């Protein structure tokens, strides 16, 4: 039935919106929808020609039937187009989310048993590299990992060009942290919980190991990068 394939694509986009990673591009579904839309377009052209013939013969009854068929065909084509655009837009939004993080997409696609992080160096790099979008508050489904192999060719080009735009934009305001939080911090020190294992973290006040489910009372500025990258969550 027309529209079933597009519905599957939208369901995939809905599931992907709750993930912290971008899943593989559904090229087969997209191609099927494009083929279906082309077939519908051929049907629409045939119905238009038939409508012209019916008008010449003044067959009112069949003309109304033809008009209904043509109307439904156009609606199906428009729905397929909307579903395709919604799918592409949802993936583009997640790609732009990831672009604001200072994470290498190739490294995030490979598993590592230990991760060594120095937050002091991350803070220094944040003024010249990408950081999390300041408008994003809920990081539970924020895009924190990206496998370039899951993107199609056009998405890979979009990712690289968007990164270049961010770097060019931020280079004009070197003295301003454009990626900083728009709301002032309520507390200097916060309680955090470790969400996944990592390596040793060195801060100005000492070191601690990222062990899943462990909790720490740390200075917020020292662990902001780890929160953005999905290693920690703030306990409120």
UniProtKB/Swiss-Prot annotation:
In this chain, composition skew of type Low complexity spans 109-130
**Can you quote a single GO CC term?**
nuclear replication fork
Subcellular localization: Nucleus
Give the span(s) annotated as Disordered: 109-134
- Keyword NAD in record: no
Which cysteines does the record link by disulfide bonds? Answer: none
Q: Gene3D superfamilies from the entry?
A: 1.20.58.1030
Which controlled-vocabulary keywords does the entry list? DNA replication, Nucleus
- InterPro entries the record matches: GINS_A (IPR021151), GINS_bundle-like_dom_sf (IPR036224), GINS_Psf1 (IPR005339), PSF1_C (IPR056783)
GO BP, sorted A to Z: DNA strand elongation involved in mitotic DNA replication; double-strand break repair via break-induced replication; mitotic DNA replication initiation
Task: List the Pfam families.
Answer: PSF1_C (PF24997), Sld5 (PF05916)
Q: Which domain of life is it from?
A: Eukaryota
Q: How does it assemble?
A: Component of the GINS complex which is a heterotetramer of SLD5, PSF1, PSF2 and PSF3.
What does the sequence similarity comment in the record state about its family?
Belongs to the GINS1/PSF1 family.
What biological function has been recorded for the protein in this entry? The GINS complex plays an essential role in the initiation of DNA replication.
For this entry, the protein name equals DNA replication complex GINS protein PSF1
Q: Which gene encodes it?
A: PSF1
């Amino acid at each position: 039935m027309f529209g079933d394939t597009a519905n599957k694509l939208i369901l995939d986009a809905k599931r992907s919106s709750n993930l912290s990673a971008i899943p593989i591009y559904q090229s087969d579904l997209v191609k099927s929808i494009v083929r279906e839309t082309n077939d519908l377009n051929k049907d629409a052209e045939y119905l238009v020609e038939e409508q012209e013939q019916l008008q010449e013969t003044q067959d009112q009854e069949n003309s109304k039937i033809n008009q209904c068929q043509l109307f439904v065909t156009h609606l199906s084509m428009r729905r397929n187009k909307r579903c395709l655009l919604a799918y592409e837009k949802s993936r583009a939004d997640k790609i732009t989310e990831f672009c604001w993080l200072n994470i290498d997409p190739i490294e995030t696609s490979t598993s590592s048993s230990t991760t060594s992080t120095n937050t002091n160096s991350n803070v220094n790099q944040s003024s010249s590299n990408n950081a999390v979008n300041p408008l994003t508050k809920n990081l539970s489904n924020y895009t924190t990992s990206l496998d370039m192999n899951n993107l199609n060719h056009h998405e890979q080009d979009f990712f690289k060009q968007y990164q270049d735009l961010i770097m060019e934009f931020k280079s004009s305001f070197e003295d301003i942290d454009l990626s900083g939080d728009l709301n002032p911090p309520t507390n200097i020190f916060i309680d955090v919980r470790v969400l996944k294992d990592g390596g040793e973290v060195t801060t100005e006040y000492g070191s601690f190991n990222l062990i899943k489910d462990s909790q720490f009372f740390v200075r917020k500025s020292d662990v902001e990068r780890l929160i953005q990258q999905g290693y920690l969550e703030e306990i409120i």
